[in-house]
Amino acid sequence: MKKAPAGSFPAKPTIAPERPILVFDSGIGGLTVLREARVVMPDRRFVYIADDAGFPYGNWEEEALKRRIIELFGEFIANYDPEIAVIACNTASTLVLEDLRRAYPSVPFVGTVPAIKPAAERTSSGLVSVLATPGTVKRAYTRDLIQSFASRCHVRLVGADGLAAIAEAHIRGESFDEALVMAQIAPCFIEKDGKRTDIVVLACTHYPFLVNVLRRLAPWPVDWLDPAEAIARRMKSLLPARSDDDEFHSQDDLAFFTSRKPDYAIRRLMQGFGLRF
């Protein structure tokens, strides 16, 4: 497996900046969470970290991936001293969130888990599908959420192999085969006893980048449930309120890629999000 080169993280500034909010994902999907977080907290500073050297996480053996993420966060925390860390990746959250909290108890961690509870509260038909990576689908954590919050619903788990990579291609402006997307989402749509699936939970932060494509390809309209706004509100709730007297050293929001080799399209995308390398 590819690993980030040793000593690849920028040195911590000598003048302490405002402690940032760290947003972490395996790729660019976490930008959907960053976008909502900025709406909720426009006065905060962010550092976006993509573990593109390890992407896609679905190809990893679980224990090896756990070790990788825990080790990476040791570097991130030492270099950026985050006020809070957000795991903007369902696969990583369902696998390693509790391990991170134990390893770094001084840092509050917010995870991204499938929005099964709000889906169960909103559905009219009782037919809900969860569109996720195969790793998220197979985790006991996901099934525990269904048992706890959606036991009265019919919940179908749909493991989409490769859809996150298609989303990355789409956001880069690259072409892709829509038939492949249709094949991935088709199992989400169920008709039973005169009722139809009315909510599809987007249980991967990459998928909202495809939502317009998903709406167009869907056999009937559904609510594509994106948890990013709820995650942003949770982040804000864990941070101390600011007063007008608070003063901070003004610094840009940053982006860091573990490969240290983001291509031109990704650099342009990050700049479009106001992130500096």
Curated annotation (Swiss-Prot):
The protein's name in its UniProt record: Glutamate racemase
GO BP field: cell wall organization; peptidoglycan biosynthetic process; regulation of cell shape
HAMAP family associated with the record: Glu_racemase (MF_00258)
Catalytic reactions of this protein: L-glutamate = D-glutamate
EC code(s) of this entry: 5.1.1.3
Domain of life of the native organism: Bacteria
Keywords for this protein: Cell shape, Cell wall biogenesis/degradation, Isomerase, Peptidoglycan synthesis
Keyword Isomerase applies: yes
Organism: Brucella canis (strain ATCC 23365 / NCTC 10854 / RM-666)
Family to which this protein belongs: Belongs to the aspartate/glutamate racemases family.
Residues reported in the UniProt entry to bind substrate: D25, S26, Y57, G58, N90, T91, T205, H206
One Gene Ontology MF term: glutamate racemase activity
Keyword Transcription regulation tagged: no
Enzyme class: isomerase
Catalytic residue list: C89 (proton donor/acceptor), C204 (proton donor/acceptor)
InterPro entries: Asp/Glu/hydantoin_racemase, Asp/Glu_race, Asp/Glu_racemase_AS_1, Asp/Glu_racemase_AS_2, Glu_race
